UniProtKB/Swiss-Prot annotation:
Residues 7-211 form the Glutamine amidotransferase type-1 domain. The keyword Lyase applies. The keyword Endoplasmic reticulum does not apply. The active site is at C82, H186, E188. IGPS catalyzes the conversion of PRFAR and glutamine to IGP, AICAR and glutamate. The HisH subunit catalyzes the hydrolysis of glutamine to glutamate and ammonia as part of the synthesis of IGP and AICAR. The resulting ammonia molecule is channeled to the active site of HisF. GO terms for cellular component: cytoplasm. It catalyses: 5-[(5-phospho-1-deoxy-D-ribulos-1-ylimino)methylamino]-1-(5-phospho-beta-D-ribosyl)imidazole-4-carboxamide + L-glutamine = D-erythro-1-(imidazol-4-yl)glycerol 3-phosphate + 5-amino-1-(5-phospho-beta-D-ribosyl)imidazole-4-carboxamide + L-glutamate + H(+); L-glutamine + H2O = L-glutamate + NH4(+). Its main location: cytoplasm. Pathway: Amino-acid biosynthesis; L-histidine biosynthesis; L-histidine from 5-phospho-alpha-D-ribose 1-diphosphate: step 5/9. The lineage of its organism: Bacteria, Pseudomonadati, Pseudomonadota, Gammaproteobacteria, Alteromonadales. Keywords: Amino-acid biosynthesis, Cytoplasm, Glutamine amidotransferase, Histidine biosynthesis, Hydrolase, Lyase. This is Imidazole glycerol phosphate synthase subunit HisH. It comes from Shewanella sediminis (strain HAW-EB3).
Amino acid sequence: MNQADNSTVIIDTGCANLSSVRYAFERICSDVIVSDNHDLIKAATRVVLPGVGTAGAAMASLKDKSLVGLIQGLTQPVLGVCLGMQMMTQVSKEHGGRDIDCECLGLIPTDVEELNSQGQPLPHMGWNQISPSMHPLFAGIPAGSYLYFVHSYRVPLSDYTIASCEYGETFSAAIAKDNFMGVQFHPEKSAAIGSKILSNFLALDKASLDAALQEPKS
């Protein structure tokens, strides 16, 4: 199979939301591949890391497919979705029935802990508003936009937060470092705003992302 010049590869992690993520991208562009093939992933213009379930099970799947080191070495734009974002951190406190923390990909220096919902129901499920930054992933996304969330664990606010949300506490709705970006919400379930965020990601390649990140912020 020949690799196209402008391709998006969704990593086949075996998770349940692969189809919905793929369909969301296919509504915007045709060149979307779901694969765990190392050569295809490395050659892609951009890569998506989806995930649902527990961090431990998801990381075990990546290890079984020998994908951990490959993902850590990617230089093109990479988008983690929901659990995919959480796997980009250093450590997750979501034990998934184990007694130890889950070591993650270590791409963004922050951790995952249980969401302090201040007595509100968990998981945090449904539509909620975000406060986005000037990061190119959120180009044209107004403050207060609603996106769809389903999660019980969260990444705290830090220098790597590029969008925030509040549910009991304020947490990172999206994080980024260099070419790695992650969103806690489900853009594939978030109607027009979610599609716009995916379109923003599809507009990125290594050169354009590097240029955007080097622009001075007003």
